Amino acid sequence: MKILVRYHDGAVPLTVLPQGDWIDLCAAETVTMHAGEFRIISLGVSMQLPEGYEAHIVPRSSTFRKWGILQANSMGVIDESYCGDDDVWGFPALAMRDTTTVSYTHLRAHETGA
């Protein structure tokens, strides 16, 4: 399977985990948030998924413990139509405490096929 990836400012090259079929995505920017604040954190990539595939954006198990943020929609779904050069993937974050999420903070993505 071939997935075309475009990296934007601040993007970290994708890391395919050695076990399983997950890809670690990272925050492409340093973000300071206050408790109760919402922000979409850029992941710095656009991808063209193969026809019939979708990606799931979910937090790592340590994201809340380390950074005090929750993914606002619990799981993001990106379908194959969100594939333009400027369709930058993001992580919708809700801060539960004052925090600074540093560039290169690992988040997580998974692709599934039809």
Regions found by a protein language model. Give the residues of each.
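DUTPase catalytic domain/fold
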Residues: M1-R108, A114
